Design a protein with these regions (language model features):
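ATP/Mg2+-dependent ligation/transfer catalytic cores
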Residues: 8-228, 245-259, 270, 406-407, ...
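Short hydrophobic/aromatic-rich motifs at helix boundaries and adjacent loops
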Residues: 16-19, 179-180, 230-235, 380, ...
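Active-site capping/gating regions of soluble enzymes
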Residues: 35-36, 44-51, 56-66, 70-138, ...
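Active-site-proximal loop/short-helix segments
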Residues: 174-186, 219-243, 277-297
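A hydrophobic, small-residue-rich beta->alpha segment in the mid-to-C-terminal subdomain
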Residues: 391, 398-400, 411-470
């Protein structure tokens, strides 16, 4: 009898080992059970997980026009019903989800994306949750869906540049609870504070664990600058920062993270807010977005150890479209009380290296030639570690009011636009600064720089002037842009900053109104 022996190459063995290594510490219960990356999940895998783990409920979750996740619950009646909902999705009323959809023809389909499956950490009954995509009556992706807009933006970026657009967010939020009076933190000095001066480290780490179990790729978490007491309440700012992933996943994990942080806050009786401003004179919460451009798995942001022409072109696009990007990233009047000098937020259109007074920052990128690990740990061998993948650029204007899909789509359009400009490198050179622009001695430099909008209405003006760029290649639909313009102009806030200057009571009314934004 003859036997045919299948030859297994060394490359296949190494690939298999690498995949297993990436899965062995994965906190997502579905990934761990199925033994495969989430992006490879099939309907059969989801059914297998449900039947093998006594899952009683399935939740469909999807972002609506207010930027928050909505939920549709399903009892698993039988195997046929489970197969039907996973295959066909379900109908929803689009007019109740999006302001641009008319009630007369509002039915939409929501269909689950299997790669997003996660075990709901808050449900009393064992529940599997999945994020969904929207489809219209003809079974086509909903053109004005925020996530589909981001998908189109990424495809357009790829078509123009031949490269991939990746992103990650820095999610800032405040936790508010009664002040015990013990170990008070220093006002506005909460950055990386430890317990017992930081009161909500355990809350943050529990949030991080749940986000990771839901598929979020987290870099780290820490307490932030904002830390103060007011009316016997302690206000503590925290941040959870993610790792760069493809832009669609970056937006998905931010949505899930906000949902988890709010639910855990509700469980413990804490107030949690992502609002851009919560009181006068204190640091507001931003939603900084880091970006990198990748080709064939290689980060293209560096060339010979310095920022590459590719990165500079992307920055140039953001410099040109920065005023209109506020329409996606700064969506209510309190956003523009954050974008003021000396409040950890940008005010002018410029960029620089390791500079927190600029709009787009190029963070420290491990370009040092020394082996810092060996210097700190003399017993370690002298080995090379490729740190080039770490380099990103950071847009610092957005805040927690943003629709994360629209925001990252807008940034993808802006970066693509940089490759369509003949003078992109000249723009990047002209807008570069290497000083703190808010210091008195740099006043002349500050005057030479364009300013960001100072109100929702001014942001709408900027978007209207540049809307054609966002609508190119069918990325942003005209209906979506019209809806954003209408929303921004509805606030009538063109002179609001001046009108309530020195009126803390009026400021607090605004804060209360937009406390739960995003």
């Amino acid at each position: 009898m003859c036997y045919t022996v299948k030859r297994v190459t060394i490359d296949n063995i190494l690939k298999y080992r690498a995949m297993n290594k990436s899965l062995e510490l994965n906190p997502n219960k579905v990934v761990a059970f199925l033994g495969k990356p989430a992006k490879e999940f099939t309907k059969a895998d989801i059914i297998n997980y449900i039947t093998s783990n006594n899952i009683r409920m399935v939740n469909f979750m999807y972002p609506a026009g207010d930027g928050r996740l909505k939920t549709l619950n399903f009892v698993i009646n039988d195997a046929a019903y489970l197969d039907a909902i996973l295959t066909c999705g379900e109908r929803v009323d689009g007019s109740s989800l999006f302001p641009f959809i008319e009630a007369g023809s509002s039915d939409l389909y929501v269909v689950p994306r299997f790669a997003t499956a996660f075990h709901d950490p808050f449900a009393e009954l064992p529940t599997l949750s999945l994020l969904c995509s929207f489809f219209n009556k003809d079974g086509e992706p909903l053109a004005s869906s925020p996530r589909y807009t981001l998908l189109k933006a990424c495809e357009a970026f790829r078509e123009v540049t031949g490269m991939e657009f990746e992103a990650m967010g820095e999610l800032e939020y405040y936790v508010i609870a009664p002040d015990t009076g013990m170990f008070p933190a220093t006002d506005q000095k909460g950055y990386h504070e430890s317990a017992p001066y930081a009161k909500f480290n355990e809350f943050r780490t529990e949030c991080m664990a749940y986000i990771a179990q839901a598929g979020g790729r987290i870099k780290y978490g820490h307490s932030e600058v904002g830390n103060f007491t007011l009316d016997e309440l302690v206000y503590e700012q925290n941040e959870i920062e993610f790792l760069p992933v493809n832009a669609l996943d970056a937006a998905d994990q931010l949505m899930i993270a906000k949902w988890i942080i709010r639910n855990l806050g509700y469980k413990y009786g804490y107030e949690v807010t992502f609002a851009p401003k919560i009181t006068a004179g204190k640091a507001g919460s931003g939603l900084h977005i880091h970006m990198r451009i990748v080709k064939d798995g290689k980060n293209m942001m560096l060339e010979n150890g310095v920022l590459s022409p590719i990165a500079r072109k992307a920055i140039a696009g953001m410099m040109e479209l920065a005023p209109s990007i506020t329409a996606f990233g700064n969506t209510n009047p309190t956003s523009y009380f954050r974008l003021v000098p000396h409040q950890e937020a940008p005010t002018n259109v410029c960029w620089g290296d390791r500079n927190r007074s600029v709009l787009v920052r190029v963070p420290l990128g491990w370009a040092a030639k020394s082996n810092m690990c060996r210097i700190a740990n003399p017993l370690e061998p002298d080995e090379h570690y490729d740190t080039s993948e770490k380099q990103t650029v950071e847009m610092r204007s957005p805040d927690g009011s943003a629709d994360v899909y629209q925001l990252i789509a807008g940034l993808a359009v802006a970066c693509r636009y940089g490759f369509e400009l003949d003078n992109a490198l000249e723009i990047a050179e002209r807008t570069y600064v290497n000083v703190n622009i808010h210091k008195h001695e740099n006043a002349d430099k500050l005057k030479s720089l364009a300013q960001l909008p100072d109100s929702c209405e001014a942001s709408a003006d900027a978007l209207e002037a540049q809307r054609e760029i966002f609508e190119r290649r069918g990325v942003f639909s005209s209906a979506m842009i019209d809806g954003i313009l209408k929303s921004l102009r509805s606030y009538g806030d063109r002179t609001l900053r001046a009108d309530i200057d020195g009126k803390p009571e009026e400021m607090m009314k605004l804060v209360h109104r937009y406390f739960n934004c995003g």
